[in-house]
Amino acid sequence: NISEKNHERCGEVAKALLGKNGYGLMFSLNLYSKDQNLATQCFEINEIYQDLGLPRSQKYKIRVSPAFPIVGDQENITLPIRDYPKVGRIMVDLLKEYPQLCFRFDCSFPPCFLDEIQEDEYPLVERIFYHGNQPVPNIQDWETSDLYLGCADDSPMDIDPQGDCFNCFPFHNLKLGNITDFKQINDLSIKKMHTKFLGHAFSAEPNEPCKSCPHYMVRCSSGCFAYNFA
């Protein structure tokens, strides 16, 4: 927020919305930099839940999204993939500090976020969700399970301010249409990327550090494909 007054107002609005609609509403944070004050952001969100009396036995989720490149004309600040482990280290520390906190990724979960995790912290990863609602399995099970944490079809539909629809927000050049093109919300929700998008996405070679990463093409598809086109 651009001012302390606006920041305070956002907190007031959040409390009012949660008070009316229940704990199911989700805060959303973009991950722009390893130096952003993620700890303060999570502290303030946790305080709101505690002030509203969230039962100790109940968890809450914060939606997080790394700031990806946008393919095409738009430029935006992105979180470099080389910084994913540093940001992941901060997130693991926050999971330890706030036992009710969970993190939710809409689409892929790049496993390099956990490159700096310690073995005694492995159980914490089950409070990280990917593809919307899938809990990340304990790291000890990764080698023996059929696990894919990368880009997936059926991801949530993104709609930009102009009403243009995307299965993958960074690929603005591959929009599915405009909300005015769909007669019903069900028609919009079942529109999928399928092979056209994935064939295009895999056409670009991965960049470093993904190209040399041991996770690549084992359980990860190089984070967000948009990095390979940027």
Regions found by a protein language model. Give the residues of each.
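C-terminal accessory region of radical SAM enzymes
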Residues: 85-140, 164-220
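Residues embedded in well-ordered secondary-structure elements
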Residues: 16, 146-148, 202
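Short, small/polar residue-rich loop motifs at catalytic or cofactor-binding pockets
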Residues: 149-154
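Radical SAM/AdoMet-radical enzyme domain recognition
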Residues: 1-86
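Residues that scaffold the ATP/ADP-binding catalytic core of kinase and kinase-like folds
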Residues: 223
